[in-house]
């Protein structure tokens, strides 16, 4: 018998969740073989979006499937998250490893009570980066058995999609660019925001030059026209609102001022955190 989870529902995972899991895995205690945490996100019935997560302290028992969770810590973290992101709800749990662990049944039982629909998702992440790839698999529990007889639980794979917004795509492209550079041994300092804007503008200019060259070649009968390309160009041009030069300059300058203000505030906060960290680390006399 299937639980009340729609296997046809679309599940979307945001990259920030994977970075949080990897960061927690790298900071795990030396005696810990895996990390476990709570998945948070939104669901509208047709699409489930995993947007956030936090690690839950636990103690493993290698000789059995028993696992002890710090429920007080988990509840406190959930309450703090609800204060900041009240729209996020518990969707399930994540763990690291190559396969579903023996403690998954107990974790499924716990998160079944925490989820509003009673059917948690299980995200399994292989953080060992075997083959230079991060393996991610998503499961949901499916009850199996005969009516009136013994029942069991089977974890069935669920299709998982990756999605990111424009801001995350900028960061992902930057990391990909750094990773693809030959001879790059370590990640360098991230370029200032204005430099990134200049680089993005230069790349946009190159693409516009390519489009104009194609159009001119078609008009000069140097290249055979392609209906698919023509429709794509038409859809792109009609989707861009017509803005005169003066209004565009005002909009661009306003966005630049907002960005400079955000840079200033983030720099001040970063400096304050660094000072607080140093003061906290100073020995008491």
From Swiss-Prot:
Keywords: Cytoplasm, Initiation factor, Protein biosynthesis. InterPro entries: eIF3f (IPR027531), EIF3F/CSN6-like_C (IPR024969), JAMM/MPN+_dom (IPR000555), MPN (IPR037518). GO terms for biological process: formation of cytoplasmic translation initiation complex. GO terms for cellular component: eukaryotic 43S preinitiation complex; eukaryotic 48S preinitiation complex; eukaryotic translation initiation factor 3 complex, eIF3m. It is found in: Cytoplasm. It holds the Pfam family JAB. Residues 11-145 form the MPN domain. Component of the eukaryotic translation initiation factor 3 (eIF-3) complex. The eIF-3 complex interacts with pix. Component of the eukaryotic translation initiation factor 3 (eIF-3) complex, which is involved in protein synthesis of a specialized repertoire of mRNAs and, together with other initiation factors, stimulates binding of mRNA and methionyl-tRNAi to the 40S ribosome. The eIF-3 complex specifically targets and initiates translation of a subset of mRNAs involved in cell proliferation. This is Eukaryotic translation initiation factor 3 subunit F-2. It comes from Drosophila ananassae (Fruit fly). The gene is eIF3f2.
């Amino acid at each position: 018998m299937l639980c009340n989870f729609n296997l046809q529902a679309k599940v979307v995972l945001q990259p920030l969740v994977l970075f949080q899991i990897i960061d927690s895995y790298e900071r795990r205690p030396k005696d810990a073989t895996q990390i476990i945490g709570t998945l948070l996100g939104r669901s509208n019935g047709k699409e489930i979006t995993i947007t956030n997560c936090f690690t839950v302290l636990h103690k493993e028992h290698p000789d059995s499937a028993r696992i002890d969770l710090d429920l007080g810590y988990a509840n406190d973290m959930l309450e703090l998250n609800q204060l900041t992101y009240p729209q996020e709800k518990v969707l399930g749990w994540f763990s690291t490893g190559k396969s579903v662990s023996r403690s998954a049944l107990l974790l499924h039982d716990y998160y079944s009570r925490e989820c509003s629909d009673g059917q948690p998702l299980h995200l399994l992440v292989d953080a060992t980066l075997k083959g230079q790839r991060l393996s991610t698999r998503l499961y949901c529990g499916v009850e199996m058995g005969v009516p009136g007889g013994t029942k069991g639980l089977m974890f069935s794979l669920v299709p998982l999609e990756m999605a990111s917004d424009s801001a995350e795509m900028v960061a992902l492209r930057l990391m990909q660019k750094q990773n693809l550079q030959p001879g790059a041994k370590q990640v360098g300092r991230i370029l200032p925001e204005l430099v990134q804007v200049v680089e993005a503008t230069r790349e946009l200019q190159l693409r516009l030059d390519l489009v104009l060259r194609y159009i001119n070649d078609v008009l000069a009968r140097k290249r055979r026209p392609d209906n698919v390309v023509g429709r794509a160009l038409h859809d792109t041009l009609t989707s861009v609102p017509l803005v005169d030069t003066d209004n565009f300059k005002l909009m661009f300058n306003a966005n630049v001022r907002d960005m400079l203000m955000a840079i200033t505030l983030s720099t001040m906060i970063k400096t304050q955190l660094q000072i607080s960290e140093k003061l906290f680390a100073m020995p008491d006399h």
